[in-house]
């Protein structure tokens, strides 16, 4: 039986210790090749100007820039401390000229309608207090015909997978936050119901090993 969802903060990761610890975890995932970059590119987001929601320390978007040509990235992050880490990491990649991090909230994306050739985000959906509103914001800022890719954990993952993931999370100081995120994540049925109430209702939801991927497109 799947336990009820436990709501998590929508303020992102704040505080120097938590930010640095999360950066270490994401760098480790990057080094293991566990980024969702290939999935994003295969979904059709591989050119022009893209938006990343909740980039955290920035590795996903930076890997996307590294693996695509003549692309640019704008990223909206609610945590000022995390933005500083992402900017530092962009300099390490030598990609600071192709990415800009903006302090902002996904519930009110600070960009005009029909701006982006693609929108992607990983691991932030469970933090959104009003996911329907964010889905509608994603739809609004996409250009007609442009695509979005949204991935996250799911609360109804196999218990053995859940246990494995908890053990794999390092450094161990991040494990309580990881468990909190798992408990705040949605089931497949829940996320389909939410999408059906948004402008992204035509999106496809696919189950993955430990989560799900949403792929959608703004109508022409």
Briefly describe each language-model feature range:
Residues 107-118:
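A short acidic, Gly/Pro-enriched loop at the edge of an enzyme's catalytic core
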Residues 118-130:
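A short SAM/SAH-binding and catalytic strip from SAM-dependent methyltransferases
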Residues 151-214:
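C-terminal alpha-helical "lid/dimerization" subdomain adjacent to the S-adenosyl-L-methionine
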Residues 1-46, 63:
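Conserved class I S-adenosyl-L-methionine
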Residues 132-144:
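A short glycine-rich, Lys/Arg-flanked "PGG" loop and its adjoining helix->strand segment in the class I
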Residues 95-96, 112, 201:
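Conserved H-loop
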Residues 51, 57-108:
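Class I SAM-dependent methyltransferase SAM/SAH-binding core
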């Amino acid at each position: 039986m799947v336990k009820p969802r436990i709501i998590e903060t929508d303020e992102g990761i704040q505080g120097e210790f938590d930010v640095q610890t999360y950066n270490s975890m994401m760098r480790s995932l990057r080094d293991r090749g566990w980024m969702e970059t290939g999935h994003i590119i295969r979904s059709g987001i591989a050119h022009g100007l893209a938006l990343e929601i909740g980039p955290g320390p920035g590795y996903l978007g930076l890997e996307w820039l590294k693996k695509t040509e003549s692309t640019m990235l704008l990223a909206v992050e609610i945590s000022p401390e995390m933005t500083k880490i992402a900017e530092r990491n962009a300099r390490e990649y030598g990609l600071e000229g192709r990415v800009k991090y903006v302090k902002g909230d996904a519930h009110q994306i600070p960009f005009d309608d029909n701006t982006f050739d693609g929108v992607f985000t990983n691991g932030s959906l469970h933090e959104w207090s009003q996911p329907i509103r964010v889905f509608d914001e994603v739809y609004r800022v996409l250009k007609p015909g442009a695509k979005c890719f949204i991935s996250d954990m799911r609360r109804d993952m196999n218990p053995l997978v859940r246990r494995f993931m908890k053990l794999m999370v390092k450094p161990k100081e991040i494990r309580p936050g990881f468990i909190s995120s798992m408990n705040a994540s949605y089931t497949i049925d829940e996320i389909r119901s939410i999408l059906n109430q948004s402008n992204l209702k035509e999106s496809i939801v696919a189950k993955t090993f430990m989560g799900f991927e949403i792929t959608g497109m703004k109508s022409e």
